[in-house]
Amino acid sequence: MSTTITNSTAERKHSHVDICLNGDVAFSTPTTGFERYRLRHNALPEVSFADITTESRFLGRRIGAPLMISSMTGGYSEAAELNRQLAETAERFQLPLGVGSMRQALEDDAYRDSFSVVRRHAPTIQIFANIGAPEVAKGLSDKDLHIMLEMIRADGLIIHLNAAQELFQPEGGTDFRRVLDNIADIAAKLPVPVIAKEVGCGISGAVARKLLEAGVQVIDVAGAGGISWQKVEEARYTRRFGSDTRFSQEGIEELLNWGIPTAACVVEVDALRPRTAGGRPFSIIASGGIHSGLDIAKSIALGADLAASAGALLRALHHGTLEATITAWLQDLRASMFLTGSANVAELQNNRPIGDTAKQP
């Protein structure tokens, strides 16, 4: 692989973090949709707040809370320190952790330490490798898959589906043919689960069904309402070229805010249970605009097995408040569980919220 390509990939990874921290890249509309729902208050909770546990299970393993520190970064020099801090925090709270896209580590082994650092600092938690749909479309060799999994002793592989991001990315790859077939091939050969993840535009029930039938075991809906990766790439494009004339002025605003709200995605994907994939169980991760323990609680009550956050936790890490932020979120979650009479996460998942499209008891 040429130095020009690897250097440009590293530059892109670095600029992504910079823009997410300093740019105005949140969705204008739609919101996550969580504001449409109210958790169902229980005036007789019949549970002691002191006895409430946030512990849960994900892919057969105990986790400290139904929260994943989602895929953020890797593949450039400063990423190793960010990933070290994320890994140490995830280990402390016993939370699953996803790394950023590992494309750069496949292109240049000099960047592999920016990923492998996570396992050195988080020896006991679930850690997930990550690669994008454009690389899947081109075809990943068995060697590529082995390198990614072994690099972090991964408990699974995240495949991120990022069509809208690639559409806006200056150097984006927009040939998404063969992605589903190649996902099926990967899922069939890997010894670990495959997670299909959007990056902010959401996964509908119809698409989730196809992914599950292809052998995917976890759907991370990654809906609209948090960071718009279209806006991140638009910022990179205008930095480079000064203005964007690729789209009409009338259409670009809607394209920059394109996506299905996170809450709507969770409801649609949860509705597939248990009819999809021959009745085989699957897990749902709610991500895209998770900013509090109330968002986590609503995600679980709508049917997700856990929530995940990247942007909000990256900002907390940048400000030195990551551990305090997670602690506060988990206290929010425990308060929500107490007020709904849910002693554990499974009980919260059966406490359907009040809302226009929420399942009613």
From Swiss-Prot:
Keyword entries, A-Z: Cytoplasm, Flavoprotein, FMN, Isomerase, Isoprene biosynthesis, Magnesium, Metal-binding, NADP
UniProt GO cellular component terms: cytoplasm
Enzyme Commission numbers on file: 5.3.3.2
InterPro entries associated with the record: Aldolase_TIM, FMN-dep_DH, IPdP_isomerase
Cellular compartment(s): Cytoplasm
Transferase among keywords: no
Family indicated by similarity: Belongs to the IPP isomerase type 2 family.
Residues where Mg(2+) binds: 166
Listed name of the protein: Isopentenyl-diphosphate delta-isomerase
Cofactor: FMN; NADPH; Mg(2+)
Binding site for substrate: 12-13, 101-103, 165
Summary of subunit composition and partner proteins: Homooctamer. Dimer of tetramers.
Protein's gene: fni
Chain residues that bind FMN: 70-73, 101, 130, 197, 310-311
Organism: Chlorobium luteolum (strain DSM 273 / BCRC 81028 / 2530)
Lineage: Bacteria, Pseudomonadati, Chlorobiota, Chlorobiia, Chlorobiales
Recorded catalytic activity of this chain's protein: isopentenyl diphosphate = dimethylallyl diphosphate
NCBIfam families tied to this protein: IPP_isom_2 (TIGR02151)
An example molecular function term from Gene Ontology annotations: oxidoreductase activity
GO biological-process terms attached to the record: isoprenoid biosynthetic process
Protein function: Involved in the biosynthesis of isoprenoids. Catalyzes the 1,3-allylic rearrangement of the homoallylic substrate isopentenyl (IPP) to its allylic isomer, dimethylallyl diphosphate (DMAPP).
Major location category of this protein: cytoplasm
